[in-house]
A protein has these predicted regions:
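C-terminal long alpha-helix characteristic of the crotonase
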Residues: 3, 85-90, 132, 141-189, ...
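A general structural signal for well-ordered alpha-helical segments in protein cores
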Residues: 48, 108, 117-120, 158, ...
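Acidic, divalent-metal-coordinating active-site segment for phosphoryl/phosphodiester hydrolysis
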Residues: 128-134
Length: 222
Protein backbone atom coordinates (compact mmCIF):
# COMPACT_ATOMS: atom_id res chain seq x y z
CA UNK A 1 0.00 0.00 0.00
CA UNK A 2 0.99 3.65 -0.29
CA UNK A 3 1.28 3.87 3.50
CA UNK A 4 3.69 0.91 3.58
CA UNK A 5 5.87 2.47 0.89
CA UNK A 6 5.96 5.79 2.73
CA UNK A 7 6.93 3.98 5.94
CA UNK A 8 9.83 2.36 4.08
CA UNK A 9 10.94 5.67 2.54
CA UNK A 10 10.90 7.30 5.97
CA UNK A 11 13.69 4.91 6.95
CA UNK A 12 15.82 5.79 3.92
CA UNK A 13 18.37 8.43 4.92
CA UNK A 14 19.12 9.34 1.31
CA UNK A 15 15.44 10.01 0.57
CA UNK A 16 14.71 13.67 1.29
CA UNK A 17 11.40 14.15 -0.53
CA UNK A 18 8.75 12.00 -2.19
CA UNK A 19 6.86 12.38 -5.46
CA UNK A 20 3.41 10.79 -5.35
CA UNK A 21 1.92 10.04 -8.75
CA UNK A 22 -0.15 7.48 -10.59
CA UNK A 23 0.14 5.85 -13.98
CA UNK A 24 -2.67 6.28 -16.47
CA UNK A 25 -5.00 9.16 -17.20
CA UNK A 26 -6.24 9.80 -13.63
CA UNK A 27 -4.56 10.52 -10.31
CA UNK A 28 -7.34 8.80 -8.36
CA UNK A 29 -11.00 8.81 -9.36
CA UNK A 30 -12.29 7.80 -5.91
CA UNK A 31 -14.11 4.70 -4.69
CA UNK A 32 -15.79 2.19 -7.00
CA UNK A 33 -19.36 2.43 -5.74
CA UNK A 34 -20.50 -0.41 -7.98
CA UNK A 35 -18.79 -2.83 -5.59
CA UNK A 36 -21.39 -4.22 -3.21
CA UNK A 37 -18.89 -4.82 -0.42
CA UNK A 38 -18.39 -1.06 -0.18
CA UNK A 39 -21.99 -0.65 0.91
CA UNK A 40 -22.37 -3.83 2.93
CA UNK A 41 -18.96 -4.14 4.58
CA UNK A 42 -18.65 -3.54 8.29
CA UNK A 43 -16.19 -0.94 9.63
CA UNK A 44 -14.83 -0.43 6.12
CA UNK A 45 -14.34 3.30 6.68
CA UNK A 46 -12.57 2.96 10.01
CA UNK A 47 -10.11 0.49 8.51
CA UNK A 48 -9.57 2.64 5.42
CA UNK A 49 -8.90 5.79 7.38
CA UNK A 50 -6.53 4.08 9.78
CA UNK A 51 -4.38 3.37 6.74
CA UNK A 52 -4.90 6.89 5.39
CA UNK A 53 -3.79 8.39 8.69
CA UNK A 54 -0.40 6.72 8.25
CA UNK A 55 0.18 8.82 5.12
CA UNK A 56 -0.08 12.01 7.15
CA UNK A 57 2.57 10.69 9.54
CA UNK A 58 5.26 10.60 6.84
CA UNK A 59 8.34 12.60 7.87
CA UNK A 60 9.33 13.51 4.28
CA UNK A 61 7.86 16.33 2.14
CA UNK A 62 5.42 14.85 -0.39
CA UNK A 63 4.79 16.32 -3.84
CA UNK A 64 1.69 15.01 -5.61
CA UNK A 65 1.31 15.08 -9.39
CA UNK A 66 -2.37 15.49 -10.24
CA UNK A 67 -3.33 14.58 -13.78
CA UNK A 68 -6.87 13.69 -14.81
CA UNK A 69 -9.31 13.14 -11.97
CA UNK A 70 -8.81 13.62 -8.24
CA UNK A 71 -12.34 12.89 -7.06
CA UNK A 72 -13.78 12.07 -3.63
CA UNK A 73 -11.27 9.98 -1.73
CA UNK A 74 -8.82 10.67 -4.55
CA UNK A 75 -9.01 14.34 -3.63
CA UNK A 76 -8.36 13.33 -0.03
CA UNK A 77 -5.21 11.52 -1.12
CA UNK A 78 -4.06 14.56 -3.09
CA UNK A 79 -4.61 16.75 -0.03
CA UNK A 80 -2.36 14.52 2.07
CA UNK A 81 0.64 15.82 0.12
CA UNK A 82 2.57 18.97 1.03
CA UNK A 83 2.39 20.25 -2.55
CA UNK A 84 0.23 19.57 -5.59
CA UNK A 85 1.38 20.04 -9.19
CA UNK A 86 -1.33 19.88 -11.82
CA UNK A 87 -2.33 20.71 -15.39
CA UNK A 88 -5.35 22.53 -16.79
CA UNK A 89 -6.96 19.24 -17.88
CA UNK A 90 -7.08 17.91 -14.30
CA UNK A 91 -10.42 17.63 -12.49
CA UNK A 92 -10.96 18.06 -8.77
CA UNK A 93 -14.19 17.36 -6.91
CA UNK A 94 -15.41 16.72 -3.38
CA UNK A 95 -18.55 15.10 -4.79
CA UNK A 96 -19.83 13.55 -1.56
CA UNK A 97 -22.98 15.68 -1.31
CA UNK A 98 -24.09 14.61 -4.79
CA UNK A 99 -23.98 11.05 -3.48
CA UNK A 100 -25.95 11.82 -0.32
CA UNK A 101 -22.78 11.04 1.58
CA UNK A 102 -20.14 12.60 3.85
CA UNK A 103 -16.52 13.44 3.11
CA UNK A 104 -13.75 11.22 4.42
CA UNK A 105 -9.95 10.79 4.34
CA UNK A 106 -9.53 13.77 6.67
CA UNK A 107 -10.90 16.18 4.04
CA UNK A 108 -12.85 17.93 6.82
CA UNK A 109 -9.47 19.17 8.07
CA UNK A 110 -7.19 19.29 5.04
CA UNK A 111 -9.44 21.07 2.55
CA UNK A 112 -10.23 24.15 4.71
CA UNK A 113 -6.64 24.19 5.94
CA UNK A 114 -5.38 24.49 2.37
CA UNK A 115 -7.97 26.71 0.65
CA UNK A 116 -9.82 28.31 3.57
CA UNK A 117 -13.12 27.48 5.21
CA UNK A 118 -15.36 29.36 2.75
CA UNK A 119 -13.84 27.83 -0.37
CA UNK A 120 -13.97 24.41 1.30
CA UNK A 121 -17.67 24.89 2.07
CA UNK A 122 -18.28 25.94 -1.52
CA UNK A 123 -16.69 22.79 -2.92
CA UNK A 124 -18.25 20.44 -0.37
CA UNK A 125 -21.80 21.83 -0.36
CA UNK A 126 -22.05 22.15 -4.14
CA UNK A 127 -20.01 19.06 -5.09
CA UNK A 128 -18.84 21.17 -8.02
CA UNK A 129 -16.02 19.97 -10.25
CA UNK A 130 -13.17 22.35 -11.00
CA UNK A 131 -10.30 22.10 -13.45
CA UNK A 132 -6.60 22.54 -12.84
CA UNK A 133 -6.64 26.27 -13.58
CA UNK A 134 -9.41 26.89 -11.05
CA UNK A 135 -7.64 24.67 -8.51
CA UNK A 136 -4.49 26.76 -8.93
CA UNK A 137 -6.41 30.03 -8.53
CA UNK A 138 -7.92 29.01 -5.18
CA UNK A 139 -4.69 27.50 -3.84
CA UNK A 140 -5.70 23.87 -4.17
CA UNK A 141 -2.74 23.38 -6.52
CA UNK A 142 0.67 25.02 -6.03
CA UNK A 143 2.04 24.76 -9.57
CA UNK A 144 0.24 24.43 -12.89
CA UNK A 145 2.01 23.33 -16.05
CA UNK A 146 1.50 21.37 -19.25
CA UNK A 147 0.52 17.74 -18.84
CA UNK A 148 3.78 16.52 -20.37
CA UNK A 149 5.85 18.62 -17.96
CA UNK A 150 4.29 17.45 -14.69
CA UNK A 151 7.09 15.10 -13.66
CA UNK A 152 9.76 17.58 -14.72
CA UNK A 153 8.23 20.29 -12.53
CA UNK A 154 7.81 17.86 -9.63
CA UNK A 155 11.47 16.86 -9.86
CA UNK A 156 12.51 20.52 -9.99
CA UNK A 157 10.59 21.23 -6.79
CA UNK A 158 11.94 18.09 -5.12
CA UNK A 159 15.51 19.02 -6.04
CA UNK A 160 14.97 22.53 -4.68
CA UNK A 161 13.80 21.06 -1.37
CA UNK A 162 16.61 18.51 -1.35
CA UNK A 163 19.33 21.19 -1.43
CA UNK A 164 18.29 22.32 2.06
CA UNK A 165 19.43 20.63 5.24
CA UNK A 166 17.26 17.56 5.92
CA UNK A 167 17.17 18.13 9.67
CA UNK A 168 16.07 21.72 9.17
CA UNK A 169 13.41 20.73 6.64
CA UNK A 170 12.06 18.08 9.00
CA UNK A 171 11.94 20.55 11.90
CA UNK A 172 10.24 23.26 9.81
CA UNK A 173 7.68 20.81 8.48
CA UNK A 174 6.98 19.44 11.96
CA UNK A 175 6.34 22.94 13.29
CA UNK A 176 4.06 23.89 10.39
CA UNK A 177 2.14 20.62 10.75
CA UNK A 178 2.01 20.71 14.54
CA UNK A 179 -1.20 19.05 15.71
CA UNK A 180 -2.27 18.10 12.18
CA UNK A 181 -2.12 14.33 12.68
CA UNK A 182 -4.09 14.56 15.92
CA UNK A 183 -6.67 16.84 14.30
CA UNK A 184 -7.09 14.49 11.35
CA UNK A 185 -7.20 11.48 13.67
CA UNK A 186 -10.18 13.01 15.48
CA UNK A 187 -11.82 14.08 12.23
CA UNK A 188 -11.69 10.67 10.55
CA UNK A 189 -13.57 9.13 13.48
CA UNK A 190 -16.38 11.64 12.94
CA UNK A 191 -16.19 11.16 9.16
CA UNK A 192 -16.37 7.38 9.46
CA UNK A 193 -19.31 7.56 11.86
CA UNK A 194 -21.23 9.85 9.50
CA UNK A 195 -20.42 7.65 6.51
CA UNK A 196 -21.54 4.52 8.34
CA UNK A 197 -24.79 6.28 9.28
CA UNK A 198 -25.49 7.68 5.83
CA UNK A 199 -24.67 4.52 3.91
CA UNK A 200 -27.86 2.94 5.28
CA UNK A 201 -30.11 5.72 3.96
CA UNK A 202 -32.29 5.70 0.87
CA UNK A 203 -30.62 8.92 -0.24
CA UNK A 204 -27.19 7.27 -0.34
CA UNK A 205 -28.46 4.36 -2.39
CA UNK A 206 -30.17 6.81 -4.75
CA UNK A 207 -27.01 8.89 -5.01
CA UNK A 208 -24.92 5.84 -5.91
CA UNK A 209 -27.45 4.59 -8.46
CA UNK A 210 -27.68 8.03 -10.04
CA UNK A 211 -23.90 8.28 -10.23
CA UNK A 212 -23.54 4.85 -11.84
CA UNK A 213 -26.31 5.59 -14.35
CA UNK A 214 -25.04 9.16 -14.91
CA UNK A 215 -28.36 10.83 -14.10
CA UNK A 216 -29.54 13.48 -11.66
CA UNK A 217 -30.28 12.03 -8.22
CA UNK A 218 -33.76 12.40 -6.72
CA UNK A 219 -33.18 12.73 -2.99
CA UNK A 220 -36.02 12.45 -0.46
CA UNK A 221 -34.17 13.22 2.77
CA UNK A 222 -34.50 9.69 4.16
Amino acid sequence: SIADILDDLDKEIMCRSIILYSEGKNFCAGADFSKSNFINGQNIYENLYKQALRIFKSSKPIIAIIQGAAIGGGLGLALSADFRITCKEARFSANFGKLGFHQGFGISVTLPRIIGNQQAKLLLLTSRRINGEEAYKIGLADIITDNNLLMEKAEELANEINTSGPLGIKAIRNTLNDGLVEEISNAVVKEANEQNRLRNTKDFKEGINASIKRREAKFIGK
